[in-house]
Every structure is written in C-alpha cells, then in structure tokens.
A protein has these predicted regions:
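Extended ligand-binding groove/face enriched in aromatic
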Residues: 29-184
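Short, recurring structural edge motifs at helix starts
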Residues: 2-8, 92-96, 189-190
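Residue-level detector of extended alpha-helical repeat arrays and alpha-solenoid scaffolds
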Residues: 15-18, 104
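Cysteine-nucleophile amide-bond enzymes
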Residues: 11
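Compositionally biased, flexible interaction segments
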Residues: 21, 27-30
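Alpha-helical repeat scaffolds in large eukaryotic proteins
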Residues: 20-23, 112
Length: 190
C-alpha cells in the first residue's frame, strides 16, 4: 500500500524494481515473464515533448504536469536566475525530462536483464565521440549524483547498440578525465 494517492497509481518504476529483485533472488522461473515483458513494453510511448519510444508512466506524467502555484513560482524564479547566468537551476520541465530518461533506462535495463528487449528501439541519445563528449561536458559534475545518473543512462543506451565500440571507449575516456585520484569518486570541483 502506498503512502500517497500518486504513489498508488505510479507503476512503471516499481514494476522494474520488483522484477530486478525477483532476478536477484533467482526466482524468475516462478513468474510469467512474457506477460511481465508485455506489461513493461506497454509503457513505451511517443508523447510530444519527449524522445520517441521513451518509457513513460502516464500517471507520473499527469502528476508532474499538474499545475501548482508554488512549483510554477519556483520555476519562474529559476528561469530568471538562469537567464542572469548567476547560477543554473533545473526547472520542473528539465527534471521531468531527466526522470523520463531515467525511467526509460530502467525499463530497458530491466528487460535486458531478463533476456528480453523493448518492442521499439530507443535512439535519442548521443552516438558518436563528439556528441557523447559534448553531452557529458554539458552535465554539472559538481552535482555528481545527477550527472552520474545521466552518464549511467548513456552507458545503458550505448550498450544496446550493435556498433558500440566507439561509444564505450569514449565513455571510458571521459570517466578517466573526471575521476578524482585521491578518493576514487567521479566529480569535478571540491
């Protein structure tokens, strides 16, 4: 049972999490993976404003887009500060786009973990050395949790491609640039 109404209705992330736990516990043979695969693939959508073939929980999308005065006000202030270039804040729309990318990564990696694939290929990610480096350099590595999540998404998306050698080497080379040799963590700044 969920603590909130929203949590009760959001299913994609929890379904991936449950299936990963079943995999870790080596209990896959006790479940109908064909139905589970179909269920996860049913979330693959083409919704305006998001990359084609993303995995999108429509309930999450509904609650994220629901108008709230405080969220709207914060976004407007963030946009003004961003324009002034004093500091850079993520708006609700950017957070939502990153969430959808993370859910897509999670669904694809879950399907591959159980030996299955998405119905349609997800292709909206950097694919060559220049695009990959440009994308990774655009991330805020002073906030490694978020940047690392985006890096992980790129690793998953790159791993499902047939021609992945350049991608993988570019990802490895970039990680070597941002690793801190004193603590072994991946970030920039202090």
């Amino acid at each position: 049972e969920s603590v909130t109404e929203q949590g009760e209705k959001i299913k994609l992330g929890f379904s991936c999490f449950a299936l990963k736990i079943i995999f870790i516990l080596n209990q896959l043979e006790n479940y109908d993976l064909k139905n589970w695969t179909s269920y996860l693939n049913s979330y693959q959508n083409n919704i305006k404003g998001f990359p084609d073939n993303s995995f999108i929980d429509n309930n999450y999308l509904y609650y994220s887009r629901k108008f709230e005065v405080d969220k709207f006000t914060k976004d407007q202030i963030k946009k003004i500060i961003n324009l002034s270039k004093i500091k850079s804040y993520e708006t609700s729309q950017t957070k939502l786009a990153n969430y959808i990318k993370a859910e897509t990564k999670q669904a694809i990696s879950t399907l591959y973990q159980i030996g299955e694939k998405p119905v349609k290929n997800y292709i909206d990610y950097p694919k060559n050395k220049y695009e990959i480096n440009n994308y990774l350099e655009s991330l805020n590595w002073n906030l490694p949790w978020n940047a690392g999540a985006q890096f992980a998404s790129l690793c998953v998306f790159s791993s499902i491609e047939k021609e992945q050698n350049e991608d993988v080497n570019t990802l490895i080379e970039f990680s070597k640039k941002i690793v801190n040799s004193s603590d072994g963590l991946y970030y920039s700044g202090s």
